[in-house]
């Protein structure tokens, strides 16, 4: 599974509207909601602060908000990017400063998806995998056997 190691901020401009995507790693719904509220306070003068987050090893918890944009044109496209990229334990807020030109529903969907991708590109993503740490005591003769065993494809 892929997770955000360090968050970032990406920005795009579409027909004079400015879209700022802020990305942060989160571990719980409470942490995601707190981050969304912090970002809304930071960009209090923006027209919209749309959000999406995914939490859980199997992406069990997903939420999104259009924050006043037409239904399914902001939060859901942002969430779709996170799900398609198989990224979890992440929250994204895309802030929109309206530039005076209406984008239409298709334009909004593309803009919010592009902004989310820009935010992810500005973040550091890592592959997280389960593992265990082992402490093995052996003599020098056993070292070669262990190296062979751990070098096998399915261990």
What are the residue ranges of the model-derived segments?
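Short, flexible, solvent-exposed loop/turn segments with mixed acidic/basic and small polar residues
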Residues: 10-14, 122-127, 155
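Structural motif
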Residues: 21-22, 50-51, 89-92, 133-135
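Short secondary-structure junctions
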Residues: 44-46, 86, 151-155
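Active-site beta-strand/loop microenvironment that shapes enzyme catalytic pockets
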Residues: 74-121
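Short glycine-/aliphatic-rich beta-strand segments at the starts of folded cytosolic domains
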Residues: 125-142
């Amino acid at each position: 599974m892929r997770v955000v190691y360090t968050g970032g901020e990406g920005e795009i401009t579409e027909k004079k509207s400015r879209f700022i995507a802020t990305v942060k790693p989160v571990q719980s719904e409470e942490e995601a909601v707190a981050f969304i509220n912090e970002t809304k306070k930071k960009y209090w003068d923006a027209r919209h602060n749309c959000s999406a987050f995914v939490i859980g090893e199997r992406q069990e918890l997903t939420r999104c908000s259009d924050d006043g944009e037409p239904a399914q044109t902001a939060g859901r496209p942002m969430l779709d990017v996170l799900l398609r990229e198989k990224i979890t334990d992440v929250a994204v807020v895309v802030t929109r400063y309206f530039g005076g030109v209406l984008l239409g529903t298709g334009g909004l969907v593309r803009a919010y998806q592009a902004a989310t991708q820009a935010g992810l590109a500005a973040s550091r993503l890592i592959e997280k995998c389960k593992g265990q740490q082992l402490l093995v005591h052996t003599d020098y003769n056993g070292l070669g056997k262990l190296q062979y065993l751990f070098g096998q494809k399915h261990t």
